[in-house]
């Protein structure tokens, strides 16, 4: 019997796959537990439509990420910070991913989620710093920061 998997089933198939499985297994286990449904021509058509919509949505997200990368790669896109600095040359406050995200939004109107900004630890030094940003699984950019003494 041909079934369309509605969820990942270990050893049998992944969500969205169409596979041939034994009839008893399909009727008594997969279909009863809503892990799969019978692959009729109508359900196959629905699946193809959903997959096309998903691909289109992913393409839009990728295009948006590439547009943000283009803005971040420009030389004039340099996020400015003014921080108080102690005698040892380190800032009193630290610059976190949240602060970077907020300043990027305020100064350039570019929205980047703070969770996408890759910071090992908050920045406490002054000068020019480049911070990597993972905009999409295929798109990575750099945010240029200029941290000056206030």
Curated annotation (Swiss-Prot):
One of its GO terms (molecular function) is rRNA binding. One of its GO terms (cellular component) is ribonucleoprotein complex. Keywords: Ribonucleoprotein, Ribosomal protein, RNA-binding, rRNA-binding. InterPro entries: Ribosomal_bL9, Ribosomal_bL9/RNase_H1_N, Ribosomal_bL9_bac/chp, Ribosomal_bL9_C, Ribosomal_bL9_C_sf, Ribosomal_bL9_N, Ribosomal_bL9_N_sf. PROSITE patterns: RIBOSOMAL_L9. It holds the Pfam family Ribosomal_L9_C. GO terms for biological process: translation. Binds to the 23S rRNA. HAMAP family: Ribosomal_bL9. Belongs to the bacterial ribosomal protein bL9 family. NCBIfam families: L9. This is Large ribosomal subunit protein bL9. The gene is rplI.
């Amino acid at each position: 019997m041909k079934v369309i998997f509605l969820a990942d089933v270990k050893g049998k198939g992944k969500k969205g796959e169409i596979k041939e499985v034994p009839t008893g297994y399909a009727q008594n286990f997969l279909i009863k537990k809503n892990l799969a449904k019978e692959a009729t021509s109508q359900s196959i058509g629905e699946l193809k439509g959903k997959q096309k919509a998903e691909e289109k949505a992913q393409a839009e997200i990728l295009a948006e990420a590439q547009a943000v990368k283009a803005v971040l790669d420009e030389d004039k896109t340099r996020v400015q910070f003014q921080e108080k600095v102690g005698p040892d040359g380190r800032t009193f406050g630290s610059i976190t991913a949240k602060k970077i995200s907020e300043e990027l939004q305020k100064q350039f109107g570019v929205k980047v989620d703070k969770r996408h900004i890759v910071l090992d630890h908050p920045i406490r030094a002054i000068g020019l710093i480049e911070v990597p940003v993972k905009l999409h699984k295929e798109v990575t950019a750099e945010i240029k920061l200029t941290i000056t003494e206030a």
